């Protein structure tokens, strides 16, 4: 190119980049930091007019221009564009070709392989050819001892199915991810929860990295050293417990919108959960009512309490993450930390409001009682005591708790909270995106997030809470708990899908109040395997696969979320799912294909289905390597990691479906 062939311009020609508009509820960005961004320079290249194709190679690096040049020089793909496309196609065929399918229709197979492809896209390699990478401290490091640096960990989404799937079909990479996350702790100081290009971001809820690490460690402990178990426990312990001094001057904890990322990366939620047993919903409100007129019972201590919000979602997820840390502590042989975090993991019980008289008023669209016994619910701390928090004015509901807004009012007036419990009813349909009591949903969806202790969840649903001190055995479930668990599941899937007109845009793909289009509910269809009616898991999973997944431009429900939505489909189509990441076991669903062969750690695992069809959705019998499955239709990771066979016999007759094991 000659000097006249290219023109460099400033970012002012791309003004929209600097004019960041915050989402509803998001704080306004700092003007000075945005001004700095606007002064950054991009390069605009004008190649003039030509009838010939222009072939350009672009190299990127997280370390700088020199790194990008080295990466470009190391490229051996050549300059034939069509040939490079073919090389890419062959590379993907080599990966996807490891998976063999028989049966099913063309659309099912297209959907399966497309979904499988999406699960392999991220996290992706984020280091130069010479091993240099940018760490979480903003500095350039040299990868040693086989370390591989990855980026794009959307872990609040992907800990649920995408990462567990990798432990099955791509074990070595799953191990690399765990080691990479531990290295990010070492270069940054805490584990990330949504890492992007060596930046913490602080996006979403809780501390999902501990789930990702625990899951691969419990499945393949032989791959890790005692020192790595100790490091994982240290990283988890320091990450989930707020430390005001730890991040005082850290570069990675500064950004344009939040300034100090202690607001979102290392929050104070767990301090309250451990001290008082739950996260008060009024933590962020100042006692002097300075920031929210009327909130005279606010608890706010300092600015770091401002984002102690979404108390129920944080409380439930943190209880599960504490359980994950306990599993790491067990591997590390640290009994004290195991007992501490197992005790903390029981705190989900403090959010459940058992009130069958009140919630028994809820009805389906035909006027039938739903049978709900209670919900996970926010609570205030008022004069040292826990008080349930309300979210709607009673005058906006009828006698069956259905929305009935009086003339002269609108929905916003019904839900406005200008004083502690000015609202006088807790309405389970009220949905929220962010910033209130729940994250991207309502209590219908969030009530089910206690995957680490489903028996304990069933017991509180039955009004029989059991406070444990001995964690050597799982909690026993009572008969009343079993009945209530089933009743509440049925209520979820039969509730009105359109009850709340303020639903978050992340809420889509409704079956009752179950939401397939967002992550918190992804395990819920499989919970019928813990009831006397396990065939309902097969019905719901089949319905979700057929209604919400299609190989078309608009065929995927919700947000793909870096492979999680697709990973749910892949595992469900194979016929099994992991309800509790961190526990090396799986439960069954409804297999979509007559035969599927997938790569596993040390061989091939085969799923076969006799009498399989679109109508034969019920499981008549099932074995793993010729043996009957365990309770709740489960089998262990050890049953598949060396290869083997999961064999189904299907039927279209619901009366022939297997009963509870």
What is each of the regions a protein language model found here?
Residues 1-149, 226, 230-241, 651-661:
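Acidic/polar, glycine-enriched structural segments that form the non-catalytic walls/loops
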Residues 36-49, 626-643:
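Short, surface-exposed beta-strand/turn "edge" patches of beta-sheet domains
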Residues 60-63, 593, 614-616, 628, ...:
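Extracytoplasmic low-complexity repetitive segments enriched in small/polar residues
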Residues 610-612, 629-660:
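Beta-strand-rich ligand-recognition modules
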Residues 145-160, 168-169, 210, 223-346, ...:
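Active-site core of glycosidic bond-cleaving carbohydrate-active enzymes
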Residues 101-158, 166-254:
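N-terminal core-entry segment
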Residues 617-621:
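Beta-strand-rich binding/interaction modules
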Residues 601, 624-627:
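Short strand-turn-strand beta-turns centered on an Asx-Gly dipeptide
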């Amino acid at each position: 190119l000659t000097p006249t062939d290219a023109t460099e311009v400033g970012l002012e020609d791309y003004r929209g980049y600097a004019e960041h508009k915050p989402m509803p509820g998001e704080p306004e960005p700092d003007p000075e930091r945005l001004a700095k961004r606007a002064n950054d320079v991009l390069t605009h290249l004008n190649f003039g007019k030509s009838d010939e194709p222009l072939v350009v190679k672009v190299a990127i690096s997280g370390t700088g221009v020199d790194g990008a040049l080295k990466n470009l020089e190391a490229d051996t793909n050549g300059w034939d564009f069509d040939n490079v496309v073919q090389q890419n196609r062959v590379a993907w065929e080599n990966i996807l070709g490891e998976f063999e399918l028989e049966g099913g229709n063309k659309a099912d197979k297209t959907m399966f392989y497309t979904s499988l492809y999406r699960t392999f896209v991220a996290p992706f390699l984020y280091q130069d050819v010479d091993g240099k990478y940018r760490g979480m401290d903003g500095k350039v490091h040299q990868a040693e001892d086989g370390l591989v640096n990855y980026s794009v960990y959307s872990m609040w989404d992907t800990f649920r199915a995408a990462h567990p799937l990798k432990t099955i079909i791509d074990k070595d990479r799953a191990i690399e991810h765990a080691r990479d996350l531990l290295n990010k702790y070492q270069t940054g100081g805490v584990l990330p929860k949504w890492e992007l290009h060596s930046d913490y971001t602080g996006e979403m809820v809780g501390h999902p990295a501990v789930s990702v690490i625990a899951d691969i460690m419990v499945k393949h402990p032989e791959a890790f050293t005692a020192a790595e178990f100790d490091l994982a426990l240290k990283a988890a312990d320091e990450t989930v417990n707020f430390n005001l001094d730890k991040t005082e001057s850290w570069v990675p904890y500064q950004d344009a919108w939040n300034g100090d990322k202690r607001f979102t990366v290392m929050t104070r939620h767990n301090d309250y959960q451990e001290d008082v047993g739950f996260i008060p919903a009024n933590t962020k409100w100042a006692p002097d009512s300075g920031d929210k007129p009327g909130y005279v019972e606010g608890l706010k201590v300092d600015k770091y309490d401002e984002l102690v919000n979404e108390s129920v979602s944080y409380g439930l997820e943190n209880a599960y993450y504490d359980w994950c840390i306990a599993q790491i502590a067990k591997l590390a042989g640290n009994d004290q930390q195991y007992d501490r975090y197992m005790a903390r993991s029981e705190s989900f019980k403090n959010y459940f409001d058992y009130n069958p008289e009140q919630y028994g008023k809820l009805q389906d669209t035909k006027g039938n009682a739903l049978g709900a016994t209670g919900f996970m619910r926010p609570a205030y701390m008022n004069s040292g005591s826990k008080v349930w928090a309300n979210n709607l004015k009673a005058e906006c509901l009828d006698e069956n708790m259905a929305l009935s807004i009086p003339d002269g009012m609108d929905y916003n007036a019904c839900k406005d909270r200008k004083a502690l419990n000015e609202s006088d009813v807790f309405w389970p349909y009220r949905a929220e995106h962010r910033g209130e009591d729940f994250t991207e949903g309502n209590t219908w969806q969030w009530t089910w997030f206690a995957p680490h202790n489903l028996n304990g969840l069933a017991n509180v649903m039955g009004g029989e809470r059991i406070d444990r001190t001995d964690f050597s055995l799982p909690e026993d479930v009572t008969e009343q708990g079993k009945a209530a668990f089933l009743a509440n599941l049925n209520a979820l899937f039969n509730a009105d899908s359109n009850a709340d007109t303020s639903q978050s845009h992340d809420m889509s793909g409704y079956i009752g109040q179950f939401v397939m289009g967002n992550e918190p509910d992804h395990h819920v269809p499989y919970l019928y395997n813990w009831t006397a009616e396990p065939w309902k898991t097969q019905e719901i999973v089949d319905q979700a696969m057929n209604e919400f997944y299609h190989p078309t431009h608009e065929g995927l429900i919700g947000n793909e979320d870096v492979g999680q939505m697709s990973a749910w489909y892949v595992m469900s189509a194979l016929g099994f799912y992991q309800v509790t990441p961190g526990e090396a076991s799986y439960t069954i669903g409804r297999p979509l294909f007559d035969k599927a062969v997938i790569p596993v750690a040390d061989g091939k695992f085969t799923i076969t289905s006799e009498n399989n069809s679109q109508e034969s959705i019920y499981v008549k019998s099932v074995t793993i390597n010729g043996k009957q499955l365990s309770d709740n239709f489960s089998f262990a990771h050890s049953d598949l990691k060396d290869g083997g066979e999961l064999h189904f016999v299907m039927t279209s007759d619901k009366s022939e479906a297997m009963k509870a094991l």
